[in-house]
């Protein structure tokens, strides 16, 4: 097969040689014989068959197509002959021949031949027949083509024939012929477009403006600017002319007038002037082709077709011109110094430049310079100079030096920022000096100017650096790197400094290395960066910490200098970098407030080494990881973690930007009012400096003043050169001056002049700040320091302003004293102020003539192609007027607006602009764009709607993606995502440091290309990263995610954009109203080589331009303003196109959140784990406890015991904290802080191994046949009778959010959402809980739901220190009822397994401390020895990360099994609890870590988490210390461990103690942000091994009774608190106290039986109402423990109250044996058991049913049924509390008694019913019968007396219910 080869720069002969070769012609012949196209998008028409039949024409067209294809090649391409013919050629010919006709083919062949062969090809007349000739209002398209042809053929002839080349001659000739042709050929055009007559006048104006833009530098290159601007402007004018003619229907379609002119006229002119036989002809023409192609792509509309899909160009702007030229040159010359690519890749490759357009142009000129030398052998000084001047922005550099000089003259000092800028300018100067020394030679004039500017800048910097400013300053930005020795923190600091220097443009000598042990700051010269290595490693008289206090401050601080002339130097460096081994202040640091030191470290980096990564000498950061620490709440918290250096650098740069903005805001007002103080209080202090500089000065003074009276009182002030000699000036303390002229010894000259600089600066500072110098003089300092204005005797002889003005100032000038004039003249000499002309202008004026002559001579000898190309590049830099015109025209649309814009743009008539603008209603909004008006575009034709939501959307969702100088618009989406456009982001193939600028702030981000998802059949792409800052999830509703359903086919929309203007350096929010339409039709987006075909788009008529991509299309959808699309491309400069939003899924949100919450636009109080995102809507209220249920008992009940506990703080403003520093303590808010800092990520491999080991142990102890699947909702609600650990769901607790919002007075808990008989309940259909349960059941199958929890302060007893010293109330989280039910369904069996197998597993949930289980735990721990770690965690609830929770979910799924659906549900349920919303009073918070305390699996998950942490760090430590691998894999054999939530005990075998102990474990966990302390002594700084007898677990100790028996005594401090405070929620105080006292006696028995007996006696003696039978005896307690140890009575609640057992009622009333189904007390009163009877469905009119303690909702019962519920009183045998009995039974008018009497009166049977246990109901029935006279008191007395005889504890009935015993 024959291959065609195309490559950049390939000559025409090479192309023809290939296409005329025999092998290729064989393929052509085969192609001519075929009648198939083999392409779906190409149709074989009659015209195509006619072309194939004519062999000569076919061959000519193939040659033309090959030459055309060659011009598009940017890199070498090999193509099969058949691929070329059936592909490119067939596509091109099909479009030309089929759509345009044979005449168009003729013109195509002629154009290609004329362009490449420079010959005019004549074709037989048969082909000139016009198949399609379009006429429009008498305007013939053929005549337009003839016009362009005439212009194209005239230009080269005219240029060739010109003698005495001049710019004016060319422009005049162009103008003359251009008008002549238009007048003769198209007379209508001049009438339609009269502005054509002024085009060339406007071009001349643009050239003059461009010359002015660069002052003297461009004086000699006006020829280049003429070529460039003439080319660009002519193309622009012709293009506008064509668009207007089409609009006015003089043309039916575009014929690309400007393109034809550009490709023929300009190129042909260059060819005629540059011989084809000249050296480098082919290459030079390729360069010109690159330039003209770029012009066509940027300035002209690009029309191209040929396929069924429409191709659209991605939007471009003037910067694109230079990008395209750079890309073309790179492809032509592979040896270019830099390789500049397309789009943002090109910008990124020069990211080290200063982000200016001139820098980019300088690089392009460098490529042209290299090209001219290598190809043409032409060494051009102009291109070398231009590359330097533009590439390094020499002009701007000189202007800034001039501004700094003038600022110094006006103030006599340089500020902190000015010195910083001097350092930046010095570095740029040094780089330019290096370029001149190593690169191409520049002109001597340019070189000398740069060297002079650098010398002046060095002098200015030297003078300012030794001065210091006694005024307010910015607080320096401090970065501390902390870590262990040999972790590379010093290297890290060095690398950070280097990168900060590069980022800020600073040089290497801008760092001062400070030794804190030295008193003096020797060598300090106001360097912007100070580095302190090994901070505080060595003690000093003034500690390093103490020194830092004054350095990091905004107040002036004078540093101690050794030299007297440097006294008064103040510190004002802007950066401090330090490395240290210490986190805290040294005990000898003499710092009285540690926080003052801590707060001065703005970035504190904790440097760690990655154990799995080897050290790399070429990249020491490869094995480092970084934790960012912040000190808060008494500890260091990890606020960010980075695994690579680039992300750390981005974080530091962002923090510095924030710090800098804060400092600017803080000091703005202070700087306005601040007054600079001189370092010299008296003039004699200035004079005394001379004695310290040089011995030569003193000798000169003595010799010169030998004859002067009082010579010893004079001090030499300065010596400066003047008129070939040296002027000497001396002064005394009385301001008297002596001056003389004389020589200076050569050996002392430099020394004397340098000393004079310092003294002059001091004198000038003293003078300028002196009260003697009047304000008028200060305002004219430039003239007064001009040395030309002083005569030989230093008398002022100049003129200030015009003569009249000077006369007004003459009195003030004459008032100047001699020492004033002497100092002003001296400082003028020092600053080089020889005349009033500004320094910057003098620099250029000095070389103006030299450059003009050199450049004009050199450029005249260049080949024309090089002139045109360079001219085009120069216009890209300085053609501001032209580009402004282009911007106006491209934004003017295609209608009447374009006509008006063309008239204004190309006319030289002055226009007036109103100096007031239309008020913008959006300026009153508090958005980022408040002070930047949202302006309507020139082509917008409607007023913006009154709805402010459009601006709100812009503020919330718009952002800019900034890479170097490129600003791309992006759209932020909730879930840490943004939407971009593919033709931009596809070029970013490597990680990059970028900036994200939102409406609120700008931050650095490390862009990771792998996180970008490109959407199929869309031009949009979606980027996601956890490092992106999220936006409010309420913004989700601002997007139209379902356009097929919501969006109409046609609609009116707002085109909203916020672009960065590279010219004004500002943000420009703009909008326009567009009429949009959804089009389902293929269109292709083109951007260079990029192609993407999309089937659906939003289209609108709008002349959009480059950088519009990313703009939002916003319209009203369903009554709400939403984003419906994102702009991605434009076509024909009149059609805009947007892509519909990609099909994204929302992040899981809590159902109904928007109904109850007002979400903030941004998050507040954000930390790593939490952020405040909203608040409850007005008038909504979450009921929380406001007062404690704990009641203080009388003093005598305390029995002399101490108590250090009080009830916790439940509300803000607790009166106990009034008038204290904690008066504003908020317990709800404080409880959230534990979630602020989750633990760091763990190594995934090691974590996986750890979890697998735990999972294997679960399987090892799994009983055969044990059920692990999910349970039914009935079992989840009611539990399973007879099965341990399968208890029912507690119904008295809160129902959670949002159900609590519907709670009415008197209602509480979950009971109101269930129905049943009290034992078997079910959800009531139709309630909010039932509906939420159904919804959540479906949701968890596919996604992680977002829960809403209520943070509720915990009502408990706390130590005094946690209430008064440092308040700390614990919160528990109330989760929704439906979530708790589902968790029970899917995890109840797993929980049952964990609790049941606690004898072999570490988790001890369910342990009975009174039983033998405690002894078993002790035995397990002792099996490894007696070295035990007793551990406690800090803020354990907030540590758990999503990484750990996901691992636990996977473990449980693998263990419990089930299908994919069940596993997904389990995992989503678990993941939901560590990513939720929390309501704290009226605030709504987002929490992204930890386990809520109200989670049903909290204690189980925490126990497993506890075990994972210990086992993970065990393996980690043993691996780090190279322990035998057998030890690493033998945790179970070498470690015994028990856990209960965050409590643990770890018994360590002696063989692994060298590798695993408390110190190593504490340090290893701290590396991951986990703080673990000694569980016994929480204040201890160490974690040491303890004996088992010294440990505690669950606040219980280990007391050995025998070799096998261990007791678990509770801490006495907890026991005594039970006697001081009791909970009276469900019983009376006496009953509650007695219950607590019994528990205390039991616990004391485990401490010492004797102590228990004595305490019992004390209680009976001190409390009169106690009976001996109320308290258990020693033997009863002993028997209790015996039963517990035999496991006769399991204890599920850690305590057993036998007095609450209903069995105490015995068989009374029903007699001996099994209870019966019913008890008939009388004909009208009966008690029934609902196990055997059912509640009636309707009212039969004969019975009244009273149900007790069932769950039947009253509203669902028939009218004759009534439901009552009571709480059982403790010690009352299942009977209700005394309060309930008194309220409902004793009180005669209670509702219950009224029901009884009403039924009796109606002769209805009264049925009292309950389920299961009717014994208490029997007693209540007797009491009700007595109270309502249903039974006589004699009968009720007998019954109750019998009952009390069997259960003597019920004796309280005789006193509480006397009516049942006596007739009262």
From Swiss-Prot:
InterPro entries: DNA/RNA_pol_sf, Helicase_SF3_ssDNA/RNA_vir, Helicase_SF3_ssRNA_vir, PCV_3C_PRO, Peptidase_C3A/C3B_picornavir, Peptidase_S1_PA, Peptidase_S1_PA_chymotrypsin, Rev_trsase/Diguanyl_cyclase
An example Gene Ontology molecular-function term: RNA binding
Site residues (Cleavage), renumbered to this chain: 315-316, 915-916, 943-944, 1151-1152
SF3 helicase domain: residues covered: 457-622
Disulfide bond sites: none
Descriptive protein name: RNA1 polyprotein
Organism of provenance: Red clover mottle virus (RCMV)
Catalytic activity: RNA(n) + a ribonucleoside 5'-triphosphate = RNA(n+1) + diphosphate
Domain called Peptidase C3: residue spans: 943-1146
